[in-house]
Curated annotation (Swiss-Prot):
Disulphide bridges, residue numbers: none
Residues reported in the UniProt entry to bind ATP: R71, G76, A77, V78, F79, K134
GO biological process: protein modification process
Pfam family of the protein (one): LplA-B_cat
Protein name: Lipoate-protein ligase A
Species assigned in the record: Blochmanniella floridana
Quaternary structure (record): Monomer.
Limits of the BPL/LPL catalytic domain: 29-216
EC numbers for this chain: 6.3.1.20
Family: Belongs to the LplA family.
Family annotation (PROSITE patterns): BPL_LPL_CATALYTIC
HAMAP family tied to this protein: LplA (MF_01602)
Keywords: ATP-binding, Cytoplasm, Ligase, Nucleotide-binding
Miscellaneous field: In the transfer reaction, the free carboxyl group of lipoic acid is attached via an amide linkage to the epsilon-amino group of a specific lysine residue of lipoyl domains of lipoate-dependent enzymes.
Length: 337
């Protein structure tokens, strides 16, 4: 048994990287510590108990091909691109805690003349002329005899995309999930113009080896290393599923209203586990029957654009004489997801 492992992922797929993290965490040897370094391309990663619709602009994400990935730890929503270095420390050693991994990260940054410090429970900050700025957020998880500490380092993240996709629509959502805390952030390339993912990984590797006073061969991991492993495939299929990423959302309500030329419509949704379990429509239309039927048809379907659009298409077939129903369909699809 090797007491240390150092892993690098060649994949930018968040579902693969989070599946790999979870698979290794569950199957690692006793008295072992692992550092896993990875990146995701254009992804929003949300905490285990967060509401995807509340945290993210899901319509923009769907249109632009930005992935949603729900992790197994708690905490808030984060935007990932290739300007982000992701780290995961996993250990089954009895004396391990996240202060160990924080020290390794801080030592690695210090070797680049970047002086950072811990803020609160899970953040790293640096002091600037504008005050303290966040460069890293992380989450900690402990299960039985093993611990996991993972997070991000902001090297050269596209700040515009971060605010574009993490800024939720002005939907009237009431959620029981955890809401992300907006923090003032800064990219490390403002302090170190030549900083790169490879450079940071190399410094973290050195700090990792120095802390444990030993070295090991790095392991370069790609999807092809794991696609034949049944347990991993099961984890990967779960990680990328709609049910895990959206269906695990805590219960919430959604209210919509609009004024059409022919009347006003108010729509109230209750959503649980990603499914619409209550729907009620109020209208002053002179022909309320079609809308009343739609309200009933929406109950029991999943809360996503494809199923809602299909439901509306079937609904309008029953009322071909009412052209205004096409307006309702377009409004609903545009505003719900």
């Amino acid at each position: 048994m090797i007491p240390l492992r150092l892993l690098f992922s060649t994949s930018y797929n968040p579902w693969f990287n989070l599946s790999l993290e979870e698979y290794i965490f569950k199957n690692m040897d006793q008295n072992q510590t692992i550092l896993f370094l990875w990146r995701n391309q254009n992804t929003i990663v949300i905490g285990r108990s967060q509401n995807a619709w509340k945290e993210c602009n899901t319509r923009r994400m769907n249109r632009d091909g930005v992935k949603l990935a729900r992790r197994h730890s708690g905490g808030g929503a984060v935007f990932h691109d290739l300007g982000n270095t992701c780290f995961t420390f996993m250990s089954t050693q009895k004396n391990y805690n996240k202060n160990v991994s924080f020290k390794i990260i801080l030592d690695g940054l210090n070797s680049l003349n970047i002086s950072a410090k811990i803020s609160g429970r899970n953040d790293l900050i640096i002091n600037t002329n504008q005050g303290d700025r966040k460069i890293s957020g992380s989450a900690y998880r402990q299960v039985s005899d093993r611990q996991l500490h993972h997070g991000t380092l902001l090297l050269n993240v596209d700040i515009n995309k971060l605010s574009y996709y993490l800024n939720p629509d002005s939907k009237k959502l009431k959620s029981k999930g955890i809401t992300s805390v907006n923090s003032r952030i800064i990219n490390l390339n403002t302090l170190h113009a030549n900083i790169t993912h490879d450079l940071v990984c190399n410094q973290l590797k050195t700090a990792f080896f120095n802390y444990y006073q030993t070295t090991v061969e790095s392991e370069i991991i790609s999807i092809k290393n794991f696609n034949h492993i049944k347990d991993f495939s099961k984890q990967f299929n779960k990680q990328r599923s709609w049910q895990w990423n959206f269906g695990n959302t805590p219960s919430f309500s959604h209210y919509l209203d609009n004024r059409f030329n022919w009347g006003s419509v108010e729509l109230h949704f209750d959503i649980s586990h990603g499914m619409i379990n209550r729907s009620h429509i109020f209208t002053d239309s002179l022909n309320p029957e079609p809308l009343e039927e739609l309200s009933k048809k929406l109950i029991g379907i999943s809360y996503n654009a494809v199923t809602i659009q299909h439901c509306c298409q079937e609904w309008t077939k029953n009322w071909p004489q009412f052209q205004e129903l096409q307006e309702v369909t377009h409004w609903l699809i545009t505003n719900v997801t």
